[in-house]
From Swiss-Prot:
GO terms for molecular function: potassium:proton antiporter activity. The keyword Ion transport applies. The lineage of its organism: Eukaryota, Viridiplantae, Streptophyta, Embryophyta, Tracheophyta. GO terms for cellular component: Golgi membrane; Golgi trans cisterna. Disruption phenotype: No visible phenotype. The triple mutant kea4 kea5 kea6 is compromised in cell wall biosynthesis and has small rosettes, short seedlings, and is sensitive to low potassium K(+) availability and to high salinity (e.g. K(+), NaCl and LiCl); it also exhibits a reduced luminal pH in the Golgi, trans-Golgi network, prevacuolar compartment and vacuole. These phenotypes are partially suppressed by the cell wall-derived pectin homogalacturonan trigalacturonic GalA(3) in the dark but not in light conditions. This is K(+) efflux antiporter 4. It is found in: Golgi apparatus membrane; Golgi apparatus, trans-Golgi network membrane; Prevacuolar compartment membrane; Endomembrane system. Gene3D superfamilies: 1.20.1530.20. It holds the Pfam family Na_H_Exchanger. Induction: Up-regulated by low K(+) stress and down-regulated by high K(+). The chain crosses the membrane at residues 169-189, 193-213, 221-241, 248-268, 279-299, 313-333, 343-363, 388-408, 437-457, 462-482, 491-511, 535-555. It is a multi-pass membrane protein.
């Protein structure tokens, strides 16, 4: 009874702290919003005193920051740092037409060739392109790009099927895979993380480097399988008992982190004379961490089962779940939809998420075990069919999640969790692991291709300062949130440092905000360079974790046994949560 009472008191204290923090943040948020609205009203009142000829010009500038404000000083500094010619180095997706930009496609000029009816061709040429039809006329148009690649639009009247090869995609994939392998080998021989080698290799061969791969849309599409299989493997290793211990901080704590970043950025922008909407977007932008990169490091260091690893993974999963809500918020911030419409859109996304997870839960209890047993019986001699079925199941759930307006990442993780509830989770992981490693390397190399080394070198001073500021702020905010939920200093700092980068999904969020004209070009370039540089410095940040833990022990911030707990190889965590998990496992074994 006394233990239950202590747990209840501890939960009450955590709840009171959380409510107090939310009330304070909400108060400052509405205060800054009211302050910004009052400033806009004062500006409008000044405009009405002007003559009629200058009213239109004043209204156009009323939404801009106040003169001589801190935000105006920052704008002038950014205009000097990122002139207009930098737009050519890092193209803005918002400069394309809306249909192309929304689909994240590449706009390219091509020539459409429609031959004449009386044009004569050789027999071999007709046979290769299947040009022989009933009328003897070629009615299939061709497209020729700037590099003389020929694309057949359609071939409805061909007599015989011909395999059409995309040699451009094959050559690009060969370059990316070979360069990623060389980069990984070089960094492995130097005793450094291979992830850094993948990122650096991609930046060298990409458009910002030697330009071996100039058009990245096809490579990026194939590389997206890396994120899908990474999260699928993570779902296969999912443990409900371990996540149950950290769910109190992973779910409300993750939401609190996003809310805090949005509030702090919005308040800072308002007090400095900037736009409140830009500040809120920057907060949402900074709250996203790199799921693929962090998971890769945690897997390499065997830290998934650690306490800080479980909290980190839970927070990353929650961020993936919140992606749809953030996309619904962007039109509201950009002024393209009303507040009521934005709230309804977010409520719709939340309802779809709950219904989708509920349907998957029912399938995981009924259909999935039967399906896996069937595949096992059919794959008694070889695992080929079982491996193919596991991959197909992952892709199907991820595709359904994407079609419902959720994310591919959420669907692939949910597919892994569905299989983790069965007895074949470990067998499935062994079958999928080689595929995961291959596509993960391809994905990280494609992320490296987004990094323009020339652009980073020209603005390394301001971008490095921005990255250091992001690392410090994210580490402090995340550590405070974790500490509020009753965890020790060591766990809070480790979670903060693990999430102290900007995720690769922020590129998509940034592109969508640029299409909605939510941010200006100079801020777009600053955030783009900061995100790229933060991904490059993430391996170094993980290398510094043991040194930070050792320093914390010397300064008596952490317990003396923290340095042994953070050995990263076969890491165990010595906490009340770990003891509860071990007792639960021992009890289940004893009962069996």
């Amino acid at each position: 009874m006394r233990r239950c009472k202590n747990n209840t008191d501890k939960f009450s204290v955590i709840t009171m702290r959380l409510l107090t923090l939310l009330l304070i943040c909400t108060f400052f948020f509405f205060f800054s919003f009211a302050y910004s609205a009052e400033s806009d009203n004062e500006t409008d009142s000044v405009v009405t005193r002007e003559i009629n000829g200058t009213v239109v010009e004043s209204n156009a500038t009323s939404a801009k920051p106040r003169e001589d404000s801190f935000a105006d000083m920052i704008d002038r500094a950014l205009e000097k740092e990122f002139p207009d010619n930098d737009q050519n180095e890092v193209p803005d997706p918002g400069s394309f037409n809306n249909s192309v930009a929304d689909q994240q496609a590449v706009l390219e000029t091509v020539a459409r060739v429609k031959p004449k009816k009386n044009e004569t061709k050789t027999k071999e040429e007709k046979s290769f392109f299947n040009l022989d039809n009933e009328n003897g006329v070629e009615d299939t148009p061709r497209l020729i790009d700037r590099k003389d690649n020929v694309f057949i639009m359609s071939n409805p009247k061909s007599k015989y099927p011909v395999l059409q090869l995309d040699l451009r995609l094959i050559s690009d994939l060969v370059v990316v895979i070979v360069s990623a392998t060389c980069g990984g080998i070089a960094f492995a021989c130097a005793g450094q993380p291979v992830i850094t080698g993948y990122l650096l290799a991609g930046s060298i061969i990409g458009p910002g480097g030697l330009s071996f791969v100039s058009e990245m849309v096809q490579v990026e599409t194939v590389a997206q399988f890396g994120v899908i299989f990474l999260l699928f493997a993570l779902g296969l290793e999912f443990s409900a008992a371990k996540l149950r211990v950290v769910r109190a901080v992973a779910i409300p704590g993750g939401l609190l982190q996003i809310f805090l970043f949005m509030c702090l950025s919005g308040i800072t922008a308002s007090l400095c004379g900037g736009k409140l909407t830009e500040g809120i977007f920057v907060g949402a932008f900074l709250s996203m961490s790199s799921t693929a990169v962090v998971l890769k490091f945690l897997m390499e260091r065997n830290s998934i089962s650690a306490l800080h690893g479980q909290i980190t993974v839970g927070t990353l999963i929650l961020q993936d779940c919140a992606v749809g809500l953030l996309f619904a918020l962007l039109p509201v911030l950009g002024g393209t939809s009303g507040v009521l419409q934005g709230v309804l859109s977010m409520a719709k996304s939340l309802a779809i998420l709950i219904a989708f997870l509920g349907a998957l839960f029912v399938l995981s209890r009924t259909w999935v075990p039967w399906f896996l047993k069937l595949m096992t019986s059919l794959s008694s001699q070889t695992n080929e069919l079982y491996q193919l079925a596991a991959v197909a199941f992952c892709l199907l759930v991820a595709w359904c999640s994407d079609k419902l307006g959720l994310s591919l990442e959420l669907g692939s993780f949910a597919a892994g969790v569905m299989i983790s509830t069965t007895d074949l989770a470990q067998h499935t992981l062994e079958q999928v692991e080689p595929i995961r490693n291959f596509f993960a390397a391809l994905f990280l190399a494609s992320i490296g291709m987004l990094i323009h080394m020339h652009f980073l070198w020209n603005h390394v001073d301001i971008l490095l300062a921005a990255v250091l500021l992001v690392i410090v702020i994210k580490t402090v905010v995340v550590a405070i949130v974790v500490k509020v939920f009753g965890y020790n200093n060591k766990t809070a700092v480790l979670v903060g440092m693990s999430l102290a980068q900007i995720g690769e999904f922020a590129f998509v969020l940034l592109s969508r905000a640029s299409n909605l004209h939510l941010i200006e070009s100079k801020l777009y370039l600053l955030l783009l360079g900061t995100t790229a540089l933060s991904l490059v410095t993430t391996p170094l940040l993980f290398k510094l974790i043991p040194a930070v833990v050792h320093l914390g022990v010397l300064l008596r911030w952490f317990s003396p046994d923290s340095s042994t707990e953070i050995g990263f190889k076969g890491e165990l965590y010595h906490s009340e949560s770990a003891k509860r998990i071990s007792l639960m496992i021992q009890g289940s074994l004893h009962d069996s």
